[in-house]
Amino acid sequence: MGELVILHKQLGDTVLLEPVLRKIAHLTGERVHLLCPPQWRPIIELMPHTQFATGKRRWMPDRLRALDSGGRTTRAAAFTFCREKVLLVPEPGWVTRTHRAVYSQIDAVAPGGRDMARWLWDSVGTDTGPKYEPPVLERPPEDWTREGLCPAEPFVLLHPVTTSLTKACDPAQWAALLRVAHDLGLKRILVSGGMEAWHYEHCARIASATKELGVTIEDVSGMTVLPEFLHLLSRARLVLCVDGAASHLARALNVPSLTLHAVGSVPEEVNPRHVHLAAGATNAAKVLHELFTVSDTILDTPSTGPLPTSLREGITGSLRAAAR
């Protein structure tokens, strides 16, 4: 019945799961079945090697891998008919009596400074096969939007919020960057956010600060469902965001992006299309200008056509790139 993977976490974490799902598909030669919050199902539809777990493959898999130790995942694992149930945790202290009763194997692997995507990749399976590559998603189809939402001309998408208020950056800094983008020729600017009260307030403050600099933006906060947001982000000329799901999605969809980090450390990886800076960085405007120039010359967008069968059977990022 194939392999079942269970993860009940936020949207960004589900995106970061893509490389290890790709690896499992390569190792087993079959599509992986993922049990996650149902609202993230559109993300799964953009992973050709994975499908949302339903039917017998949900309840009677050949093997089960739980990639988080939360109660929802543990309950789902307990009611799955499968002898081989493996739990991955970052440290032994996370293991409880319930975990020992439910799982046949518990692997405690310290992240060691690795991000979630790389930690999962290194902790699951063997070192043979494809090498690690960051998350990759297919381009959302055209029917994932509605009339009047996605501009026809090149536009900037600003997503300045996430689930944590501590990651929010100064509206004045966003306004200054949007002024730079406007001067570069990107006159159409959209700002998006969720439906929390502070999301609306924060986006409104950014719009006000931007207006003072002579730039008008369109606020679509709380006005998109997930498929529409994915479509909108994938068609943007440039994405500006905080560290969170939007940043991971921009990377996975290969949309040029600038991510500001208000808390935590800035990733050391250097990628000319996906730049990370500490909030308040004095060179942000210069970096944005360079990002615009580089991304305009390196045209490496995902294919919009159907993927070959070889990519759907043990897909790897390198194979996907070669098929473009």
Features from the language model and the residues they span:
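Catalytic machinery of carbohydrate-active enzymes
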Residues: 1-324
